[in-house]
Amino acid sequence: MEHPENSEEYKGLVVNKGIEQPSSVNPYLKRKPKKRQLSVAEFVEGIVKGDVTILSQAVTLVESVKPEHQAVSQEIIEKCLPFSGNSIRIGISGVPGAGKSTSIDVFGLHVLEKGGKLAVLAIDPSSERSKGSILGDKTRMEDLSVAKNAFIRPSPSSGSLGGVARKTRESIVLCEAAGFDTIFVETVGVGQSETAVHSMVDFFLLIQLTGAGDELQGIKRGIMEMADGIAINKCDGANIDRAKVAKAQYQNALHLFPPHESGWSPEAITCSSVEKNGIPEVWDMVERYVQ
């Protein structure tokens, strides 16, 4: 009898019949159909009606780098332009750790108490290595994030300079078309030269800390000369006296700049996001400037 190894069909491996392995895919699984892409008309209709879900989707399209998304978003923006331009745009900037996000949380609630609708566009820095972004600003706005008539949209800077994202202007237009009458643009923690947000907003608020510099900071041409107002944050506890000294120093530094074309004289105000003092005074300064 010829040995089976001499057969041409012999593979050198013998597999005994056993239990068949179950399929890795559940046969009873029902696949959810993909969402249909909304048309431009549906996007515009939803935005104008104040649908924040559709507004978020539209902002995502605007921020996308895909050519097909850019073409659709351009049409959406063009059709939303007639509904925009009716808000107070406030840019909020400052050094990292100055308390911008926490201040916006308290400041935003004050705006909502007056019956307004608030949109916050928070720009978060992107990693130069991984290109990713934590988008953690919203987590610091605990009360505002669950408040009615408030919309918070974190966006990555994606390497854009100037403290804002590449499509911040377009996002502002969409928020205005959705009926938000007050818009905060929170920049990344900026230095003295990143002032792109100034050209996008009506009022540019700079949040500073005590001990961050003396009058020499006022001489340095940069972000301070663009500010319409300075809020010296963390004026609480043992920091109150230092905050008052800083207020006087910044107020003196502001006089070193040429006067604004509008005749407005920038002011320095002390406030505390923790104790919630000085917030009405900051908003009063904004209203006086806008009027």
Language-model features: where?
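Alpha-helical scaffold elements adjacent to nucleotide-binding pockets in ATP/GTP-utilizing enzyme cores
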Residues: 134, 171, 196, 200, ...
